[in-house]
Amino acid sequence: MNTSAEDVRASAVRARQAAGQLAPLSRAAKDAALLGMAAALLDRSAEILAANALDTAAARAAGTSAALVDRLTLTPERIEAMADGLRQVAALEDPVGEVVRGRVLPNGLELRQVRVPLGVIGIIYEARPNVTVDAAGLCIKSGNAVLLRGSASALNSNRVLVDVLREAAVAAGLPADGVQLVPGADHDSVKHLMRLRGLVDVLIPRGGAGLIRAVVEESTVPVIETGVGNCHVYVDVDADVDTALAITLNAKTQKVSVCNSAETLLVHAGIAAEFLPRVLTALRDAGVTVHGDETVRAVDPSAVPVTDEDWATEYLSLDMAVGVVDSLDQALDHIRRWSSGHTEAIVTRSLAASRRFVASCDSAAVMVNASTRFTDGERFGMGAEIGISTQKLHARGPMGLPELTSTTWVGIGDGHLV
């Protein structure tokens, strides 16, 4: 049965009301709720696992790939990790009420720019049920209400998870409707959510390029784009070969199914004779399929011929596009053409080259002699994140608690008049 626009709108209205109750809450109240949610996840883990078993069984019956089934699967260890994530969010500083800057005007009026919640945040995501808990925790801590629209393949899991979170919220004195699952599992529910400008303050899609593109193109609600990571490693002519080899392997193979893994390796022609044989052998030994240009294939004939589609692809697998460039300028031109704006890395001993690379890469993060895998809220020391924003407004890079707030100007006077 198709989900009605009225049902989705009613949920958003309730979320808007809950947001008004969440915004002024103290840190102590929000932290108590998060800790209660963590305990409730563990207390009801058997119920969560039973619901998840229904989802994974249906996915296998539908012929879903093993990788996607793994993303969908919950285990006692993964539930413990979700609970631990909530405890970690509770330990983070509360951004709400932080004074970003302030001044006293010549007439004595005191001005402060203060962080405030965004309001109602809609999260549209795919098969990972852990996102349900992660997103809810971050939104609650930052004083926002959240509307969660996960994949239909995880519907049973998400229903139980949201029920657990809502009950724990109420037990801690928070409004239940601060955390809601968007009604329905059909595409209509997503379309209705994307039309609720004025009730929903922002949508954050988490998933593949197709999902993000559809939300950006169809939504009337403001969207923060996250996640698509066609990340590059450029090995400069002045690179240390051992360092370049280690960074390339880490960026590509440490965890392939994440947005900050490297998908393209560019090698300066001046170091190719020394570096290519070593890196191609190491990639092959790690199980990576290399998609190479003519120079690469002359060194390793087993490499697959690279295409424009390869240069544009976020593989999320043991595949890597590899090419040789004649200069730093050519590497930068390639990155400007094909990058998704997530993370780029340069390996070099040249300070001038590194500065030029940093200044010229228009991406959310740029690494110098470090792996692309560092682009992550926790690795940046920011704590948990809701995603990696690859756009320039309203946030860019890892989106932690401060990025889930806006600001308001507060003027404190004593009968001041203009």
Swiss-Prot record:
What Gene Ontology cellular component terms go with this record? cytoplasm
Q: Which reaction does it catalyse?
A: L-glutamate 5-semialdehyde + phosphate + NADP(+) = L-glutamyl 5-phosphate + NADPH + H(+)
Q: Chief localization class?
A: cytoplasm
Q: Name one GO biological process term.
A: L-proline biosynthetic process
The subcellular localization recorded is:
Cytoplasm
Tell me the pathway. Answer: Amino-acid biosynthesis; L-proline biosynthesis; L-glutamate 5-semialdehyde from L-glutamate: step 2/2
A GO MF label: glutamate-5-semialdehyde dehydrogenase activity
EC number(s) in its UniProt entry? 1.2.1.41
Keywords on record: Amino-acid biosynthesis, Cytoplasm, NADP, Oxidoreductase, Proline biosynthesis
The record's InterPro entries line, in alphabetical order, gives: Ald_DH/histidinol_DH, Ald_DH_C, Ald_DH_N, Aldehyde_DH_dom, G-glutamylP_reductase_CS, Glu-5-SA_DH, GPR_dom
Family statement drawn from the similarity comment of this UniProt entry: Belongs to the gamma-glutamyl phosphate reductase family.
- Say what the protein does: Catalyzes the NADPH-dependent reduction of L-glutamate 5-phosphate into L-glutamate 5-semialdehyde and phosphate. The product spontaneously undergoes cyclization to form 1-pyrroline-5-carboxylate.
Q: Which PANTHER family match?
A: DELTA-1-PYRROLINE-5-CARBOXYLATE SYNTHASE, GLUTAMATE SEMIALDEHYDE DEHYDROGENASE
Q: What is this protein called?
A: Gamma-glutamyl phosphate reductase
Q: Whose protein is this, by species? A: Parafrankia sp. (strain EAN1pec)
